[in-house]
Curated annotation (Swiss-Prot):
Disulfides per UniProt: none
Record key words, sorted: Ribonucleoprotein, Ribosomal protein, RNA-binding, rRNA-binding
Native species: Aster yellows phytoplasma
Composition-biased stretches (Polar residues): 241-252
PROSITE patterns documented for this protein: KH_TYPE_2, RIBOSOMAL_S3
Protein name from the UniProt record: Small ribosomal subunit protein uS3
InterPro entries tied to this protein: KH_dom, KH_dom-like_a/b, KH_dom_type_2, KH_sf_prok-type, Ribosomal_S3_C_sf, Ribosomal_uS3_bac-typ, Ribosomal_uS3_C, Ribosomal_uS3_CS
UniProt record similarity statement: Belongs to the universal ribosomal protein uS3 family.
Protein purpose: Binds the lower part of the 30S subunit head. Binds mRNA in the 70S ribosome, positioning it for translation.
Amino acid sequence: MGQKTNPNGLRLGIIRTWESQWCVNDKEIPNLIKEDFLIRKLINNFTKKSAISQIDIERLKEKNKNRITISVHTAKPGVIIGKDGDTRNKLVAKLKELTQKDVNLNVLEVKNSDKIALLIAQNMAEQLENRMFFRRVQKMAIQKALKAGAKGVKTLISGRLGGAEIARSEGHAEGRVPLHTLRADIDYAAVEAHTTYGVLGIKVWIFHGEVLPGQTILDTRKPFASQSSNTPNRRPRNFKGGNNNHVNAKKN
């Protein structure tokens, strides 16, 4: 089942925590789920080119039910903040209008964007929309992630690859990506690329390392984290979606 399910959801409560944290009554949960969805949609649409990797929403204190703390993790904080904070103030005003609550917006910088699955997938989608060859896009993304300190990377692109009449899936992987190991810190993202031939689906898995007892995800995601595993590096391999038989890449 590790190959089929979303790695992020599978590890919730084990090594990952929730992006929305509340202290509310059960009756309020449906409305807050909808509100969180609208908040994230508004932020992503308001700043489309700001490379947002994660949006955390907190409502922890019952005395301050009308106050929401939103933390936006982005590789380009200047795009969200704007000149003298103008863009940030406009975004806060729109969030207050949407929620009818007091909003505290924190903008946090992501320093190592080449290791974050969502940002990698978004960058791949942009390159595919600019008509770059899909195999080159995958190999470039994998090499950047490994150079940034990732222990394993796997990518998969599905659709009319290269404008072919019949849709198919093709992927590339390097290093270890142990999807069945629950203590393995795996970052996963799925993004769509809208091309002239149709929509391409992009999936990215990043293996940062194993979260040992007494550690957290922050320990495995440090830039150039030490690789204590004795497992030798694996050869790059290409594969097709829906087929578990991996095909070794051709030797030079």
